[in-house]
UniProtKB/Swiss-Prot annotation:
Annotated compartments: Cell membrane
Protein name: Uncharacterized protein MJ0835
Topology relative to the membrane: Multi-pass membrane protein
Parts of the chain that traverse the membrane: 23-43, 251-271
Keywords of the record: Cell membrane, Membrane, Transmembrane, Transmembrane helix
Pfam families per the UniProt record, alphabetical: DUF515 (PF04415)
């Protein structure tokens, strides 16, 4: 007979085994699900983090590229700009971007220093830069320099002031080769007439700034104006080569000038003299009286006609020259010796003056001009 109690016990044991296995399976499934969920969450977090880092890196790259564009604002066509931008685009992290930016800053700083040095040299030379091979060679070497120390050594190796003075002195010598006795000199806002020897003397003492402002014009290259004035406006007749100062009657200075030629304006010469004598004679109680008179008159009319007649050989040239030669000089001398001044004499002067003073002379009435003679040949 079958033991029912054993059968029941076996069934109960079987039920417990099945129940325990199901529970384990469920637990395993649950663990797998949880682990999977955690893995998914972790993956999403990591992905989000990586995405954020990527966005941050891209933003940093954009900002860095903008910084590069600002750095190279003065040099938009510099090929180094594209090199730095490419390095930034290839960077894998912010540290690499910062390294590129730092490198670019150093490059721009050195480039600015280099250009500043070149501009300073060109500024010092001014208009003389194109005339100096030394200056151009120096600028070329600086443009190729790789460090500030190299540039500083290049600047120390040259005497820029000496080079500029040498160029200007050569220009002075070239102008003085014209052979003129006088030159119109403009320097630092002042002007004067100087001889060749005076210029050669003073050029050694003029500063570099004065030499740069120097302008020398041979008198032979100045414009000439013709002025008719009275002796009262000038005093003595000035002669060729005399340096004069021209003023207006109100005392304001107009310009310096040099007499190119001067003339006494005469149309005729007249002179008259009369002489009378009388005498009383007593003889044997009788008196006698006698008188006599004489007169001399001299008149030379149409003096310009005499000149023209001499030109066409109607009158002897040597005699006319002997008679009237240096008339103005002799007139000055006789006036000095006698202290008699003829205020009715007029002078015709041809004067060399600076080009920019021509309008000032033309617009003033010759009657309002006063001439002061500064020196004579």
């Amino acid at each position: 007979m079958v033991d029912t109690s054993k059968i029941k016990a076996l069934k109960e044991k079987s039920r417990r085994t099945v129940k325990s296995g199901s529970l384990k399976f469920i637990l395993i499934i649950l663990v797998v699900v949880i682990v999977g969920l955690l893995a998914f969450i972790a993956y999403n977090e990591i992905s989000n983090l990586q995405f954020q880092e990527k966005i941050t890196l891209e933003n940093q790259k954009k900002a860095a590229i903008e910084s590069i564009n600002q750095m190279f604002a003065k040099y938009p066509n510099d090929p180094q700009k594209l090199i730095y931008i490419n390095k930034i685009q290839m960077a894998n992290n912010i540290e690499e971007i910062n390294e590129v930016l730092e490198e670019a800053k150093k490059y721009i700083s050195f480039k600015n220093y280099k250009i500043e040095a070149i501009n300073q040299i060109k500024s010092m030379y001014g208009e003389y830069y194109s005339l100096s091979l030394s200056a151009q060679e120096l600028v070329h070497k600086i443009s190729l320099a790789q460090s500030t120390e190299e540039i500083e050594n290049l600047l120390k190796s040259v005497d820029i002031e000496k080079d500029i003075r040498s160029i200007i002195e050569k220009q002075i010598d070239y102008v003085l080769a014209s052979g003129d006795k006088y030159y119109y000199v403009e320097i630092n806002g002042k002007s004067m007439f100087m001889t060749r020897d005076e210029i050669l003397k003073y050029k050694k003492f003029w500063t570099l700034s004065e030499l740069k402002s120097l302008k020398i014009t041979p008198v032979s290259q100045l414009n000439k104006v013709a002025i008719e004035i009275s002796a009262k406006q000038c005093g003595k007749l000035p002669h060729k080569g005399d340096i004069i100062s021209i003023y207006s009657k109100d005392g304001s200075f107009i310009t310096y000038g040099i007499i190119d030629s001067s003339y006494v304006i005469l149309s005729s010469i007249s002179y008259s003299e009369s002489k009378s004598t009388s005498s009383n004679i007593n003889e044997l109680g009788e008196s006698y009286s006698s008188s006599s008179s004489s007169s001399i008159s001299y008149s030379l009319n149409n003096l310009p006609g005499i000149l023209h007649a001499t030109v066409i050989d109607r009158l002897d040239y040597d005699k006319i020259k002997k008679m009237f030669g240096e008339y103005g000089k002799k007139l000055n001398e006789i006036e000095d010796d006698t202290q008699i001044f003829d205020e009715n004499v007029n002078y015709f002067l041809i004067i060399s003056i600076p080009d920019d003073k021509i309008p000032d002379i033309i617009q003033i009435d010759p009657k309002d001009i006063v001439i002061v003679i500064k020196s004579k040949e």
